[in-house]
Amino acid sequence: MKVKVLSLLVPALLVAGAANAAEVYNKDGNKLDLYGKVDGLHYFSDNKDVDGDQTYMRLGFKGETQVTDQLTGYGQWEYQIQGNSAENENNSWTRVAFAGLKFQDVGSFDYGRNYGVVYDVTSWTDVLPEFGGDTYGSDNFMQQRGNGFATYRNTDFFGLVDGLNFAVQYQGKNGNPSGEGFTSGVTNNGRDALRQNGDGVGGSITYDYEGFGIGGAISSSKRTDAQNTAAYIGNGDRAETYTGGLKYDANNIYLAAQYTQTYNATRVGSLGWANKAQNFEAVAQYQFDFGLRPSLAYLQSKGKNLGRGYDDEDILKYVDVGATYYFNKNMSTYVDYKINLLDDNQFTRDAGINTDNIVALGLVYQF
């Protein structure tokens, strides 16, 4: 019986963390779910910057309220707290925080810190036990989590076509801190140039049918003045992203691949951005009925014609071999081996890019 139960619950654990939420309140059209996890995590690596304790926890809630028969309000917040630092250090941050309205088949609109629409497709390969999803990053234009997202989403194409979803998104400018020497581009939530963005727009479309999925996404963002100084490579007026992906998720098999081409949008360590980058991620997983889920993946990000003495360089390149074992819906353990294929050379040293292998061991409690 335990084997059958695990075969049903494990796929549910692989989607958004809130899928495993604990219901706190559900009455009179108002619902509140609490979710979270604690990951006792340790890295083993020759790179002393990452070797050691990486323990963290995440906590969040999802709420909704029935305004009318046709209108529903909703909100979500998620926070991460590092458990590997001293008590007098403030190593915590908000991952997402947004609120919105859903108008039945017409669609939903929300605003806040959220995921960019490019992640609607690239998330298909961001399923590894620990690593993965690092040909892009957070606060990286519209490629993953970011601030100031206004998002319209439509599911099942106005209720007419099952599995056909699309989204349109706008991101407001997140620029310089005050007092940084710039006369323009200052915003109330300023940050360093590598995590800034100008006004941006994007869209995505995905179609799922009987386990098969196909999707595409594009985004185009203005770059800030601080991003176009001589301090960084990859100057340009706009940061653009073009993404396509495929997936298969059925019969205990999960296969996914995505290819993304970017212009002035893929970060090159601490050096800046690639004028052009070609990013590829592919993953294969199989879910055994007794709770074991092995995983194999390949990820590569190649920068083209980088400039400043660099030509074409691999920004990221590794094979990932891992496995997760689910004791039940609340408890799991995993091992993830990142086999780094990058060479230690002048480029990786200048950019501060890690070239060492990493083994991650984790024990997770989630609710």
From Swiss-Prot:
Keyword Membrane appears in the UniProt entry: yes
Q: What is known of its domains?
A: Loop L3 (residues 116-133) extends along the inner side of the beta barrel wall and may constrict the pore mid-length.
Q: Which domain of life is it from?
A: Bacteria
For the region Loop L3, give the residue spans: 116-133
Q: Name the predominant localization.
A: membrane
Please give the Pfam families that the UniProt record associates with this protein. Answer: Porin_1
Q: What else is known?
A: Binds 1 Mg(2+) per subunit; could be Ca(2+) in vivo.
What happens without the gene? Answer: Deletion of both ompC and ompF confers resistance to colicin E5 and to the toxic activity of CdiA-EC536.
The entry's localization annotation reads: Cell outer membrane
Q: Which InterPro entries match?
A: Gram-neg_bact_OMP, Porin_dom_sf, Porin_gammaproteobac, Porin_Gram-ve, Porin_Gram-ve_CS
Q: Name one GO molecular function term.
A: identical protein binding
* Signal peptide (from-to): 1-21
The subunit structure is: Homotrimer. Forms mixed heterotrimers with OmpF and with PhoE; other mixed heterotrimers are also probable.
Role this protein plays: Forms pores that allow passive diffusion of small molecules across the outer membrane. (Microbial infection) Supports colicin E5 entry in the absence of its major receptor OmpF.
Q: What is this protein called?
A: Outer membrane porin C
Which GO cellular component term is one of those annotated?
A: cell outer membrane
